[in-house]
C-alpha cells in the first residue's frame, strides 16, 4: 500500500513542464498553419501568439499576400519558415511609414532594400531591431512561418 501511495504522489510530476518551457512539434506547427488560413485579414495575413516569455514571445504567421514593410524599434525577429515560399526584403527605408504601436513602425513598402532573400521550408533568418523588412509573395503563393521576437 505504501508503494502505491508513493507512486500516486509522483503522478503529478510526470509530464509537468517547468515554468517557461514550451515545445511545438513540426506537426503541431503545420496543423496550426492550416487553422490560420480561414482567419486572414484585409492584408491577407493571420497570426497566432503561441506564448509570452518575458523578454521574448513566439507567434506563427500565415500570409497569402505580400506584407507591409515593418521595423521593430526594440525587438529582433528570428524567423523559421514552416511551409510555402516567399522573399524577405531587408534594409533600406520605409517612406510613408507610421508608428502603429509603441516600438512598431509600418509602411507600404521599402525603398533601397539591400537583401532579397528567397525563403522556403526550414530556412531560418535573424533580423536586428531597427531594420526595415518586408515579406513579398508572388500572386497565388502563400507562406507560414514561426517568429521568435526577442526584446533587445
Label for each model-derived stretch:
Residues 73-93, 100-109:
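Short, conserved beta-strand element in jelly-roll/cupin
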Residues 4-13:
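Sec-dependent N-terminal signal peptides
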Residues 70, 77-80, 116-117, 125:
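His/acidic/aromatic-lined binding-pocket segments of jelly-roll/cupin-type domains
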Residues 13-73:
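A short, N-terminal "cap"/entry segment at the start of jelly-roll beta-barrel domains
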Amino acid at each position: 500500500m505504501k508503494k502505491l501511495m508513493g507512486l500516486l504522489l509522483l503522478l503529478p510530476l510526470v509530464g509537468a513542464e517547468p515554468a517557461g518551457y514550451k515545445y511545438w512539434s513540426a506537426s503541431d506547427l503545420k496543423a496550426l498553419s492550416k487553422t490560420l488560413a480561414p482567419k486572414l485579414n484585409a492584408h491577407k495575413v493571420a497570426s497566432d501568439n503561441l506564448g509570452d516569455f518575458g523578454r521574448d514571445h513566439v507567434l506563427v504567421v500565415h500570409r497569402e499576400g505580400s506584407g507591409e514593410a515593418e521595423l521593430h524599434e526594440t525587438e529582433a525577429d528570428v524567423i523559421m519558415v514552416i511551409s510555402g515560399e516567399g522573399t524577405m526584403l531587408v534594409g533600406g527605408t520605409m517612406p510613408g511609414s507610421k508608428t502603429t504601436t509603441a516600438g512598431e513602425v509600418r509602411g507600404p513598402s521599402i525603398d533601397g532594400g539591400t537583401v532579397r532573400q528567397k525563403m522556403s521550408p526550414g530556412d531560418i533568418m535573424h533580423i536586428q531591431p531597427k531594420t526595415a523588412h518586408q515579406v513579398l509573395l508572388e500572386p497565388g503563393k502563400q507562406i507560414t512561418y514561426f517568429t521568435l521576437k526577442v526584446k533587445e
